Amino acid sequence: MTDFTKTPRQGHHTTRCLPLLLTLLMTAVLAACSSRTEPVVINSEADVVGKTIAVPTGSIYDIDMSGRQDIKLERYTTMADMIAALKNGKADAFMNDDIAMSASDMRRHGVKIAFRSDRAFDMGYALRFDEADVVEQFNKFLAEAKESGLYDEICRRWMDAKDPNTVQMPQLEPASGTELKVATSFLMAPMCFLEGDEWKGLEIELLQRFARYAHMKLDIKYYDMAGASAALQTGKADLWSSSLFITEERKKSVLFTDPYYASHEAYYVLDEQATASKGLWQSLKDGVHNNLIVEDRWKFITDGLRETLIISICSLLLGTLLAALICWMRMSRRRWLQSLAAVYIDLMRGIPLLVLLMIMFYVVLAQTGLSATTVAVVSFSMVFAAYVSEMFRTAIMSVGQGQQEAGVALGFTPLQTFRYIILPQAARAVLPVYKGEAVSLFKNTSIVGYIAIQDLTKASDLIRSRTFDAFFPLIIITIIYFLLAWLLGKVLDWAVKGKVKSEK
């Protein structure tokens, strides 16, 4: 009989992993501390020739610069990543709106605007073509706000503030009536940002005032750019608010409101007048303070952890039950059941998990009213069941046919034979590989942010969008994922060990 108990070599697995984890943490902190010192001079468009320029992926700057052969273009998803590229020497400058960073944020991260172009881009909210009445209402509201002076007052309060974080949102009575679902994928002061659990910024205040004007109730959710676009087109969102530039190409896909602001393109470089790099200990303290303590940002982590655990546990339970059903179908004597199960398994194996998740949320289950969390549980359960069902089938088939015949000879019914003879042996055989699949399921939940679920990974994105710290939030969730995956593995190891002892 194979002994599945832990060997001494396996027992030291965690001991070996901890130094690696600490090394990863120290490396990230040192990377955050390091700073490139060579000044980059950009006083005009001509000065960018031959330089490495970072741009936000899919932005108007990406589109404009992608055809140039006289520069090296690097694409990044977040502002934090572009700042890190600047400090690590991977980019000489990055392009973004001139309002992308407040003066206080630029001072804190040691960057400055080297050159601001005269070219301006109008910003507007995007809606579907069937929402022309909402667009008309907003345009009317905006025109009245400009005429009354309210618009200018809002712009002065947010855009002239040295630190947008200190600007207070107006105390407006909550709007009621038809719900206006807003998708945002832009988290930068002073336009749109989270302070604790409160949405703030120029865009948000305009939307709140418009909601009261039009007797609508706001529901704001954060998506990435691709997710926000899909949410708008499928009806998961009614309005897309992300400081979107109004372009002729985008007008073919969405209906824009009148412009509510205009920004200029700017080149950001390291500020040679910035303070010197901090020491390791000071950087650690600042990282904890800025990413966890300020504005109670640790709550993003705890909320994301709760969401991750809910999805993981529910998917594990539902997926295991579904796997048992599919395994029964695969081992059925009815050919049509076997074929149906085989097609299902091949289908789930052939579709990337992220693609399946987005198809289920934005297409298949879009009109059901199910929450994003429920859709995620269903999607993960479907994929988990496809893989685990084959593990179950292989484990059952590993039990000799003679044992089943012996059970029947002893007077057991087929069900009793399976329950008391085959199942215990199959369970002992399948648990080690089941453990690996369960841990993979837990780690794969990190993609649920694509459907606007604030899990652990999305929590780190929210923190990074506020602090522009590229490393610290990621290291925090890396440690959490590692510890939880290790704990899950230990629980399943305990189950295997207990099963072996019970049989002895």
Residue ranges and their predicted role:
Residues 77-78, 97, 224, 352, ...:
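Short loop/turn segments at beta->alpha junctions
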Residues 279-504:
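Transmembrane alpha-helices and adjacent helix-loop boundaries
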Residues 2-5, 9-52, 58, 146-219, ...:
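N-terminal hydrophobic or amphipathic helices and topogenic motifs
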